[in-house]
Design a protein with these regions (language model features):
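Extended, low-polarity transmembrane helix blocks
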Residues: 1-31, 46-58, 62-155, 174-181, ...
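Membrane-interface interhelical connector segments
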Residues: 28-41, 155-175
Length: 239
């Protein structure tokens, strides 16, 4: 039996707006999202980057309109999973398979695909059993991604710690390790289903706190494309 289900909370709206914001910055900068590792020598790279950004604007905006939410989410899922993770980031992962950062970078893009899958499953007019399976698949994928996010904090503490405000006690390293552990704990909870909803909510709060504490202060000094916030919407969707 096909049934329509409301998308998780208001996470689908945050998710859609996040995609739109990211795509608008891509248009302003005239390039791909840094997580989309399109080769520099790619023919007509600027044109393709523009096309990708326009697609993301349209799809992200379509998420906000309930009549097109499901199809827009499906389109974003396919784009991030197949085009970004496989075609763009896949070759780099094969070449740099021994570097942890290669996996965490792919995980960042895969998490966006996982959130799109969950939005699609919870909104589309599809069989309830299939919807539940797709939702769980998206949650499992995101759980694995969270493990990679946490691991990156430990592997690259020399890069993570300086992002923490110096005024935040007890130390930058403490919060670097604490947030890394938080990612891993949340990922395990989501994967096992033990206190998964609580873990997702807390992870969302942590993602959201990164914006005023980490991203905004850095962006005010150094406008870096790769520091644009966008994880909170994904956390909202997973909850």
């Amino acid at each position: 039996m096909a049934t329509g289900r409301p998308a998780t909370g208001f996470g689908w709206r945050v998710y859609g707006l996040g995609v739109v914001a990211l795509s608008l910055v891509c248009l302003a900068w005239g390039g791909f999202d840094p997580g989309q590792a399109a080769p520099k020598a790619l023919p007509d790279r600027a044109v393709l980057a523009f096309a990708a950004a326009v697609f993301m604007v349209v799809a992200g905006a379509a998420i906000e309109w309930r009549r097109t939410t499901a199809w827009a989410a499906a389109s974003l899922t396919a784009y991030y999973a197949l085009v970004v993770c496989v075609l763009m980031d896949g070759p780099g992962l094969v070449v740099s398979y021994a570097e942890y950062g290669s996996y965490s970078n792919v995980a960042e893009q895969l998490a966006i695909a996982a959130a799109g899958l969950i939005v699609y499953a919870t909104d589309a007019q599809i069989n309830a059993v299939l919807a539940a399976r797709l939702t769980r698949l998206g949650q499992m994928i995101f759980g694995v991604c969270a493990l990679f996010f946490g691991g990156a904090h430990f592997f690259y503490m020399n890069l993570t710690a300086p992002l923490v405000p110096k005024w935040l006690p007890p130390s930058q390293e403490f919060w670097g390790y604490a947030t890394g552990f938080g990612h891993i704990a949340a990922g395990l909870a989501i994967l096992t289903g033990v206190q998964a909803r609580l873990a997702s909510i807390l992870l969302t709060v942590m993602f959201a706190s990164f914006t005023p504490l980490v991203h905004v202060p850095i962006l005010l000094v150094d406008v870096r494309f790769d520091l644009l916030p966008g994880s909170a919407g994904i956390g909202f969707v997973v909850t």
